[in-house]
């Protein structure tokens, strides 16, 4: 009997080679992501929205296979709608994160999905949960994921402070994502943010020409070589 080769099937899939992030602050959470979607080296979409609504005040950030993460998010959204109908109350952020973790773990051989779940609920207030590829559930004050995250862990460790308000947290997420996008070839485009509090969800958009700019380096050797060639040319003219 023929079997499906999952590795071959997934070889040409569309991936969210990405930078995603969620940070908790005193009255809510800020989530953010870049907008680049790739198929190998080809940029399939430059303005993807990787912040996915799963319930009123619960969102997820998606990294990995676009098809896998969309399917998982749709399933969780369905179950949370059923939950709220059955119990007459909105689900907690932990309930949503547990559903994501269960689906990712039980199907880890078929899925490539890294998820960050964040939001606000009446039980605990703001919270952030990280579900890495393969499953697992970790509550953290901040979480980053995707291919761009490897370049900014040190920046996050050195910069993050407890007790921040909304404005400081938004700037932290914006700067972190801009740094990741400047180093990771699979991240890019624009930055999409969402601020989730008891009052609701506020969406923010930062176009590419308004991203924070940091030191981007310069080729010192190249400048020295130009000076050398100029000097040699002058010597030849004088000779």
Regions found by a protein language model. Name each.
Residues 1-239:
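Long, low-complexity N-terminal extensions
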């Amino acid at each position: 009997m023929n079997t499906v080769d999952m590795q071959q099937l997934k070889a040409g899939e569309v991936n969210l080679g990405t930078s995603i992030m969620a940070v908790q602050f005193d009255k809510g959470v800020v989530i953010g992501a870049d907008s680049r979607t790739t198929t190998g080296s080809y940029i399939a979409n430059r303005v993807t929205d990787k912040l996915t609504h799963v319930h009123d005040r619960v969102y997820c950030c998606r990294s990995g296979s676009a098809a896998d993460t969309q399917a998982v998010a749709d399933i969780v959204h369905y179950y949370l709608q059923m939950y709220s109908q059955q119990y007459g109350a909105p689900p907690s952020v932990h309930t949503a994160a547990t559903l994501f973790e269960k689906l990712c773990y039980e199907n880890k051989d078929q899925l490539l999905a890294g998820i960050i779940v964040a939001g606000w609920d009446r039980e605990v207030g703001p919270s952030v949960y990280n579900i890495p590829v393969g499953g697992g559930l970790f509550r953290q004050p901040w979480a980053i994921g995707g291919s761009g995250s490897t370049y900014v862990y040190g920046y996050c460790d050195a910069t993050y402070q407890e007790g921040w308000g909304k404005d400081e947290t938004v700037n932290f997420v914006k700067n972190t994502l801009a740094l990741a996008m400047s180093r990771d070839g699979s991240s890019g485009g624009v930055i999409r943010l969402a601020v989730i509090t008891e009052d609701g969800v506020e969406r923010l958009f930062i176009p590419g020409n308004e991203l924070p700019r940091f030191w981007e380096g310069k080729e010192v050797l190249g400048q020295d070589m130009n000076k050398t060639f100029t000097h040699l040319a002058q010597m030849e003219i004088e000779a």
